[in-house]
From Swiss-Prot:
Protein keywords: Ribonucleoprotein, Ribosomal protein
Organism: Phytoplasma mali (strain AT)
InterPro entries documented for this protein: Ribosomal_bS21, Ribosomal_bS21_sf
One Pfam entry name: Ribosomal_S21
Protein name as annotated: Small ribosomal subunit protein bS21
Amino acid sequence: MPKTIVREEETIEETLRRFKREVSKSGNLAAARKKEYYIKPSVEKKNRRNKMSLR
């Protein structure tokens, strides 16, 4: 998890913006969203096949 230290004379908005940027770069949020629901391996394979056929 990214850590953000508040710098001197930095507003909360700037710190929050910096923190959001670090979180998006780390990919933690995307990984958490991906694992939000369990997808059966057979369904995952079916989705991959459909995705490849669309290309």
